[in-house]
């Protein structure tokens, strides 16, 4: 499957997360993003070094600035289960705006065409690192990394595109 690209409508799919009342929710991506400007950024795995020390903190630190430029939602996405994503989110007590969501089986990652095969590292099939800017479900920015790199998908990269 070809990777998601600028001009595409983001596919619909199901993701899971814990809401503000600590209740497990399952929702469609379209229900979360329709009619909104949304950043959907993906990471290969919760608690992994680059994701935990660079990618996620950048979006947390820049969240207010992103929102001031019209972003309604900032969603962190990973092929992990929702319990892992909840625990990972709690390691950022300063976070007020980034929602941590799970693609437990990797099905949505497949729909995006953004799988990263990390079986040789014992991690299975994960998501490539990426940052998408969606405007009412349409991809307006698609910053997708090669392999496990972190060169084009930061919060600063999205800010430059806004």
From Swiss-Prot:
* Protein's cellular compartments: Cytoplasm
Alphabetical list of Pfam families matching this protein: Redoxin (PF08534)
Keywords, in A-Z order? Antioxidant, Cytoplasm, Oxidoreductase, Peroxidase, Redox-active center
Which processes are annotated in GO (biological process)? cellular response to oxidative stress
A molecular-function term among this protein's GO annotations: thioredoxin peroxidase activity
Per the record, GO CC terms?
Answer: chloroplast; cytosol; nucleus; plasma membrane
SUPFAM superfamilies for this protein: Thioredoxin-like
Key word Nucleus present: no
Q: What does this protein do?
A: Reduces hydrogen peroxide and alkyl hydroperoxides with reducing equivalents provided through the thioredoxin or glutaredoxin system. May be involved in intracellular redox signaling. Thiol-specific peroxidase that catalyzes the reduction of hydrogen peroxide and organic hydroperoxides to water and alcohols, respectively. Plays a role in cell protection against oxidative stress by detoxifying peroxides and as sensor of hydrogen peroxide-mediated signaling events.
Miscellaneous note of the record = The active site is a conserved redox-active cysteine residue, the peroxidatic cysteine (C(P)), which makes the nucleophilic attack on the peroxide substrate. The peroxide oxidizes the C(P)-SH to cysteine sulfenic acid (C(P)-SOH), which then reacts with another cysteine residue, the resolving cysteine (C(R)), to form a disulfide bridge. The disulfide is subsequently reduced by an appropriate electron donor to complete the catalytic cycle. In this 1-Cys peroxiredoxin, no C(R) is present and C(P) instead forms a disulfide with a cysteine from another protein or with a small thiol molecule.
Name listed for the protein in its UniProt record: Peroxiredoxin-2B
Look up and give the organism this protein is from.
Answer: Arabidopsis thaliana
